[in-house]
Amino acid sequence: MLTLTTLASGSSGNCTLLSDGETHLLLDAGISCRRICTALAALKIAPESLSAVLITHEHSDHISGLATLHKRFQLPIYTSPGTARQLCYRIAALEDVVRPCPPGNSFTAGGLDVETFPISHDAAEPMGFAVSDGNRKAALVTDLGVVTEAVRRGMAGAQLVLVEANHDVEWVRSGPYPYYLKERILGRQGHLSNEDGGALALGAVQSGARTVVLGHLSRENNTPQRAFNAVNAILSAYGPREAGLTLSVAPRDQTGPVYTV
């Protein structure tokens, strides 16, 4: 059995817990260490019992709590070599605990197998993760401007997926952001729109996913209902929704439900 719980998911902070009941993995640490510890306590998990922290990339909404988390608990950190260099440049104390893993490779953390795959984002060497207990698989991918074959392969066969639905394209285009920021968001190294996230979710469902969680929504350029409606329409357009298929949106600033596969 695998469980996934988002502690925060959005442009202002991202942190997710994956667990099989014995091995607990934290994916990103983009909220304060205090918030992480409070959320874990509510789930009856001691922070020191975490097996590892997995970091997708070095942007602040994914690592803002990492320095304090390391200072208190000295947990092993798995990330790509490029991200590892960025982390150690910013937080020298991490050099002893960072374990680089090139995208496309895999490793074992506690009792869980972790696959990595490259993603397209404006960071040093970003990557997504897929975690398996040998029978069940969960895949998580946000912060990407385009869905590549490597992403599809990495997510294939996952029963539970967390995918990005960052923005409504027309809201970005007509909104107050400066031109360069609009181009960044909409570009190939930016973020997935609701429609792009829906297409990715559809592919995941067609390869076995039964739980789809939408994450990393923009506060300014999206709403949970708008993201849900857009993705639900894409899933429904390819036939009646399959029995047992769950679609939901991760909360931005609070702990979400515990999803189990």
Label the predicted regions.
Residues 60-63, 84-86, 124, 146-149, ...:
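Active-site environment of divalent metal-dependent phosphoester hydrolases
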Residues 64-73, 88-89, 222-229:
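Metal-dependent catalytic neighborhoods of phosphoester/phosphodiester hydrolases
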Residues 33-79:
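Active-site metal-binding motif and surrounding structural segment of the metallo-beta-lactamase
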Residues 1-43, 127-143, 160:
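Conserved beta-strand hairpin/beta-sheet module of binuclear metal-dependent hydrolase folds
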Residues 105, 111-116, 120-121, 133-138, ...:
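Conserved catalytic scaffold of divalent metal-dependent phosphoesterases
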Residues 81-128, 132-135:
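Metallo-beta-lactamase
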Residues 27-30, 51-58, 78-81, 139-142, ...:
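Active-site neighborhood of phospho(di)ester-bond hydrolases with catalytic His/Asp-centered motifs
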Residues 149-251:
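Cap/insert and terminal regions of metallo-dependent hydrolase folds
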